[in-house]
Amino acid sequence: MIFNSKHFTVILLSLSIFIFNGFLTVSAQENQANNSESFGIEEIIVTARKVEESAQDVPVAITAITEQLRKSNIRNLSDLQGFAPNVIIGNYGERSGGANLNIRGISPPRSDDNSFDAPIAVMIDGIHLGTSAGQILENFDLERVEVLRGPQGTLFGKNTVGGVINVIRSKPTGEFGARLKATIGDDGQQELRAVVNFPISEGKVAGKVFATMIEDDGWLPNITLGKKVPEKDYQNFGFSLLFTPNEKFEATVTIEQFDDQSDLAGYHYSYNFANGVATPPTDPRQVNTALATTACTNYGACRNSLDIPSYAENDTNNDAALETDAITINASYQLTENSQLVYVGGTRDLTEYRIYDFDASAAPFITIERWNDYEQTSHELRYERQTENSTLVAGYYFWNSEFTQDWVTGGEFWKTLFGAVAQTPALWAACQGTNGLDGAFAPIACDLGIQGGLGPNDIVTQILYETQETESEAFFLNYEYDINDKISLNAGIRWTEEWKAFIAGQAYLSNVERQRERNFPGYADLYQKWDEVSPRVGVTYRIDEDKMIYISYSEGFKSGGFFGVNQNIRDFERDQYDPEFASNVEVGFKSLLLENRLRLNLTAFRNEFEDKQESFVALDPDTKTVQSVFNNAAEVLYEGFEIEALFAATRNLQLFLNYGSLDASYEEFFTDINQFDGLGTVEDASFLEPRNAPEHTLGVGFQYNAQVGNGEIEIYAKYSETGKTQTSLLNLTSGAFDGSEDVSANIGYYQDNWNVVLFGRNLTDEQYEVPTLLGGSFTSGPLFSMSNAGKRPRAFGIEFG
């Protein structure tokens, strides 16, 4: 169903009010004096196709956010919810600054491991952020954010099958000036953001320094640790230099550092119910949460109510640290009056640590601890030419990245499962003899550096390790030609070659003292190489200077790779996957109506995925048992419709509406639908609903300003909504998410060079939780369970700038 009937009346009524009110206002204006000042919607210039052009002239589904960055309650990228249809930008709370991105139902299968590439690119000043850690950028000194929906493979390359979030910061102005923003709020929120511009050599060199510091005491009481969580401690500082030695050359160099010592933002509630608290499932595919988890039974760390908790109880604090050093260069050289060379390059070096209490209970049951090092380098060289009736962009792109990850699972979990092996010398020696590669102990290996097993008080840990290098290069071309003043043709193509070299250690059991020794009994050493072509063609018809229709066909691909979240060599070798491909047909209508007071954009799309990468259940051909596999498992069709409307109702009032409808369906998908029946039957599962594809998104709100004294009062309010979503691959009841709502608002007073703003977030104080069940079956309780603490409660703050 492309259009959600539940919201049809609301949307139709809203648009009718927009247009009807517009006609009334236009009629009233005609009766005013001829010299009355006109008003309307400001034009926004974007670089969605690598060249500067009006957003309304771009035959791409794009939302450009500019003024809202300064006047609305956008603290960071996660607050863009509701500003663009079919777009969800959330926090992935198990990584520092981690992003959970979803555009038109396209989202990463998982974001916790650097071996997985995301299908949506986050760019900052032309640099692709290659890991999800640190992608939730803080909002200050941002010139604009462009959200491009649909495959953008021709100009932006690999891993853009869902779209692109393009963030552009301001350049040094070359004049003395400063902006300062200080914020205080609930739960000890303290923020300080500053940017200072200054000339160095007049007309030749300009500079800018910037800094952001954020602290927060946390909002969720932890009754086990006796404090609030998660605490936030974030810093970003750096400088930019703008070189303009002559009229032809320009270069901006930015050097910066991020230091995020915050707790992991995605806190969990315990979902370890005691016997009989939850209702027994009727679906035989569902884990029986009415039976107590092992964490509850063995340690008494039980949850005794179905009500969403108002506290956390994990016994290990979710400590984290992310340090990032980055260098970005943007340079251009004017060749002729209408052509130039452009270079964009940069490096990013990330060091990441995190530990989280995986069972989310007061029991010392299981923790996961990870150390990551990640480096990336990219270079892009473009030739751009714009004439009266054509635009040409051609270029070369190079990418290299490398990561290393150590991770350890600890707590009492492995002692519960393999304590007899760890503490019995004969069994420990036998386990060392098989090295986890075959025999009765496979896939478990035991540390060859420890003789006689572990002591009774030792914590049994499992050690894992992986490292990967990725390198790709691409050549691309995009050309647009105006046949006449009505019709334009667009065609583009990109050729990409990429290889990945992956090494992972055979997991083994050891103790805490030796958890970083890397004493692996064996390694998986894997290599893959691909080359792909990503084309795009389109036609644009200009009805008049304010209205256009376009139709386009574009393709993109998401890189193949290796499933890094495995424990043994055999599974690493099995879980290699090829690229997935998107083929998107899009029809759009863009318009400025009512004398430039109503901007109305409509889009319909049909995005077909082939070889979609997915984790599914299949029969192992060797052991004849069922197990989870990661591979190119499905073909999926995403269809939808989008409305974007911005209406200047009066000189002082603007209304906006953003609605996206999505219908996702499998065209082909095979898996074991009932993993607990013991049959291991892999069958057609195309009747299931693809996960993480919300039925709709909605954002509606207003901005009102009025002159008061020597200044101006401005009120901004936004309501956003996300529809029903399946978070479970098998559409289990436990994974059915009913959707979420959010209301935020702010009121500010602006005068000359200062302002004060009062803001509120989650004003309806909505709460929800989404459970994750580990282990168990229809006839047995889980090993342990947790649920994501969905939203921070209602909060207020005040900002001075």
Please give the residue ranges for each predicted region.
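Outer-membrane beta-barrel translocator/receptor signature
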Residues: A118-P119, T131, F140-E143, R149, ...
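Gram-negative outer-membrane beta-barrel transporters
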Residues: T391-V393, D485-L489, R606-E608, N631-L730, ...
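Outer-membrane beta-barrel domain signature, strongest for Gram-negative TonB-dependent receptors
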Residues: G226, K232-V393, W399-T404, R599-N601
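Membrane-embedded beta-barrel scaffold of Gram-negative outer-membrane proteins
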Residues: N330-Q334, Q340-G346, T351-Y356, R542, ...
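Solvent-exposed loop segments that connect transmembrane elements
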Residues: L220-K228, A265-E313, D357-I368, V408-Y465, ...
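C-terminal beta-signal and adjacent terminal beta-strands/loops
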Residues: T416, L655, S720-S728, Y749-G801
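Acidic, small-polar-rich N-terminal luminal/periplasmic segments of exported/outer-membrane proteins
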Residues: F39-E175, V587
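Structural signature of Gram-negative outer-membrane beta-barrels, strongest in the C-terminal barrel
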Residues: L242-N246, Y383-E384, G395-W399, E466-E608, ...
